[in-house]
């Protein structure tokens, strides 16, 4: 597993060595841990689900955010327009808070507002069952390991690379197709796995 920490030197070392780090929200917003059990018990999305990305403790210059509906996407768009961030706010029209490749996806960024389909990335639309995450946390972990080990299905790899590609294109200010290709190269060459192993 990955060690969660809010120690600045540990996190800087992770970025220097692996190129990534994990910011586990409860460590940075301790008051939120008191709210977590209530949120779980309610079983519905709350204001706190919406607030999370806006209170990122690292104040990133580049940010990709997935949202669960178009109304929230529009609200985030208005809020992010008031910042100097490079941002992409994503909502798949079939309900995912990420790029699913199961249909069209709307992206609002500081560059544009676009609707795109899998074909824009040169891949085919997929079925929801092709990206099913399993029934348990263990199932999901096995799928993740297979993908990062280069043993994912084409559908799994494409969805991972579509999302990573948008994050890359947001930070590098390149088009999504170029970001997708960079993500695919990183995944299939094993570079993504090497970064994870260094964490």
PLM segments and residue spans:
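Mg2+-dependent prenyl diphosphate-binding active-site environment of isoprenoid biosynthetic enzymes
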Residues: 8
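Glycine-rich anion-binding loops and their surrounding alpha/beta cores
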Residues: 1-5, 13-199
